[in-house]
């Protein structure tokens, strides 16, 4: 089948590569325009554009696809059998959605209708979900409301951050899309008519889950509140990787990976760390107080409940380092409290 691929970030790349390596024909790629890098003010391609150019696929980069009729017509003139949208970053006009005979399809990184919208992976982690996944759905005008062709579940490992889980879901999407395209092709083999595919679709309103929207992340959410529970702080650090931060003497410090020192993690801690680490589970402290700086490991911080072990972090303008090195960089010692 002839496909126009719409995507922008790193998440989309394995799916595009899977299509390129299949028997399908990617006749065009639509992605976000080049952006200027803060260092050096150099224009850089999106990850998807880089792969498309490497494979000699025509690329279109609209600023706003809904307002650019010439680019819309160029896309329609490609005469694709279907559109495939994976984290493109703009809302497509109905003219584009309806133009291919086999419709426009989207890969969404959640188990719809839970976490429709812009930040499904982060919201799932922040809320403590134990399960996420991907959906391949037929697009319509509503935000992530279309009927579902395929859904794949994926367990959330609480010790993997949002970048790692995003990579997991991207890989899952790359294999699942080939399965989905085969379903679409075999269902419409003789007519190339979308009507033939409808019996295989599941409407979201019959799924046993109320719709929940993954609203856009706010700046305030990235600041760690040490007066919250250890597990909640851990989910903030892992879910908003690599941008969750705290402050010390007015300077911002990003924290990248962590382990809550709670009874539920005691077996994991005992199996992976020196025995004395487990003793901090019962240590009382003030929220944000440094309880220990441990060579070759990290530092332990008090919260409103159990302490939390910080494993990696980053000063402003520096590279990410292990938390014990970060502690030296910012001169942490027992008793110091984050702002």
UniProtKB/Swiss-Prot annotation:
Top enzyme class: transferase
PROSITE patterns (alphabetical): GART (PS00373)
Keywords: Protein biosynthesis, Transferase
E.C. designation(s): 2.1.2.9
GO molecular function, one term: methionyl-tRNA formyltransferase activity
InterPro entries in UniProt: Fmt (IPR005794), Formyl_trans_C (IPR005793), Formyl_transf_N (IPR002376), Formyl_transf_N_sf (IPR036477), Formyl_transferase-like_C_sf (IPR011034), GART_AS (IPR001555), Met-tRNA-FMT_C (IPR044135), Met-tRNA-FMT_N (IPR041711)
GO CC entries: cytosol
Coiled-coil region(s): none
Keyword Protein biosynthesis appears in the UniProt entry: yes
Alphabetical list of HAMAP family matching this protein: Formyl_trans (MF_00182)
Family: Belongs to the Fmt family.
NCBIfam families: fmt
Protein name (Swiss-Prot/TrEMBL): Methionyl-tRNA formyltransferase
């Amino acid at each position: 089948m002839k496909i126009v691929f719409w995507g922008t970030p790193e998440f989309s790349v394995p799916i595009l590569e899977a299509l390129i390596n299949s028997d399908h024909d990617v006749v065009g790629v639509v992605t976000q325009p080049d952006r200027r890098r803060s260092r050096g003010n150099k224009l850089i391609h999106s990850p998807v554009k880089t792969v498309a150019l490497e494979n000699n696929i025509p690329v279109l980069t609209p600023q706003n696809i809904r307002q650019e009729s010439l680019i819309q017509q160029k896309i329609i003139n490609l005469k694709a059998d279907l559109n495939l949208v994976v984290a493109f970053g703009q809302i497509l006009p109905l003219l584009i959605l309806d133009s291919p005979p086999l419709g426009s399809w989207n890969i969404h990184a959640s188990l719809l209708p839970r976490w429709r919208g812009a930040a499904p992976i982060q919201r799932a982690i922040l809320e403590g979900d134990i399960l996420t996944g991907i959906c391949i759905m037929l697009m319509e005008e509503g935000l992530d409301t279309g009927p579902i062709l395929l859904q794949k579940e994926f367990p959330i490992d609480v010790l993997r951050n949002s970048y790692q889980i995003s990579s997991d879901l991207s890989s899952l999407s790359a294999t699942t899309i080939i399965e989905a395209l085969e379903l679409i092709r075999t269902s419409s083999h003789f007519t190339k008519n979308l009507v033939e595919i409808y019996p295989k679709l599941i409407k979201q309103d019959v799924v046993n889950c109320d719709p929940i929207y993954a609203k856009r992340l706010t700046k305030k959410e990235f600041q760690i509140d040490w007066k919250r529970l250890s597990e909640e702080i851990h989910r903030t650090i892992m879910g908003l990787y690599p941008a969750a931060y705290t402050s010390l003497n007015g300077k911002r410090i990003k924290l990248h990976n962590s382990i809550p020192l709670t009874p539920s993690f005691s077996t994991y801690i005992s199996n992976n760390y020196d025995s004395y680490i487990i003793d901090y589970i019962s240590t009382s402290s003030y929220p944000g107080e440094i309880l220990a700086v441990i060579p070759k490991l990290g530092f332990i911080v008090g919260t409103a409940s159990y302490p939390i072990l910080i494993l990696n972090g980053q000063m402003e303008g520096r590279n990410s380092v292990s938390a014990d090195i970060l502690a030296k960089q910012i001169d942490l010692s027992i008793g110091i409290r984050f702002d």
